[in-house]
Amino acid sequence: MTGSSPNILILGIGNLLWADEGFGVRCVELLNERYRFPDGVRLMDGGTQGIYLVQHVQQADCLIVFDAVDYGLAPGTLKVVRDDEVPRFMGAKRMSLHQTGFQDVLALAAFTGAYPRELLLVGVQPAELEDFGGSLREPVRAQLEPALAIALAFLAERGVLATPREGDAEQLAPAQLALGRYEAERPAEELAYRHGDIRFIAQPGREDD
């Protein structure tokens, strides 16, 4: 720890554009909107930054991660994993096809000798990951509040208390990606193709040039 005030990183990872992949980021957004935290606590939308997250992990004495994790459980199941057990649950999923998985981020931080003393993963079993432009499915959305409660209790046990926020918070992500606006402005199914890039998918009755 660095003195009496540890550096705590609360990190949401995942891709907002792929339905339940956005769970981790939505958790951090809600914490940021609702609460203020003491100095030394940082909230971060980690998105799909991959290896670029290493420096932030290295600086943390305590790391809390929210994410959609394939535990092999029923959709919407919330599972908490701590410390040395965390990396093995983060290994199967890459942040994108071309980026580093979070397991690799943790491994690199450990290799450099700058690794959090405490690590908490609050993960939910996703229901849908293939709906491009989609939002959280109900079983996953229902776990937002319980996930926040777990993180707040974890912090409180360490004497770190969040206080209700008065006024608007500085946004962690572009305003158009905020949950309410993202869902309200989503095109109807008949107006948007959600299963890949239609330019590269063979269309019935259309011959190649």
UniProtKB/Swiss-Prot annotation:
One GO MF term: metal ion binding
Binding-site list for Ni(2+): 21, 67, 98
One Gene Ontology biological process: protein processing
InterPro entries with a match to the protein in the record: Pept_A31_hyd_express, Pept_HybD-like_dom_sf, Peptidase_A31
Gene3D superfamilies associated with the record: HybD-like
PANTHER family: HYDROGENASE 1 MATURATION PROTEASE (PTHR30302), HYDROGENASE 2 MATURATION PROTEASE (PTHR30302:SF1)
Function of the molecule: Not known. Could be involved in the processing of hydrogenase.
Protein name (database record): Hydrogenase expression/formation protein HupM
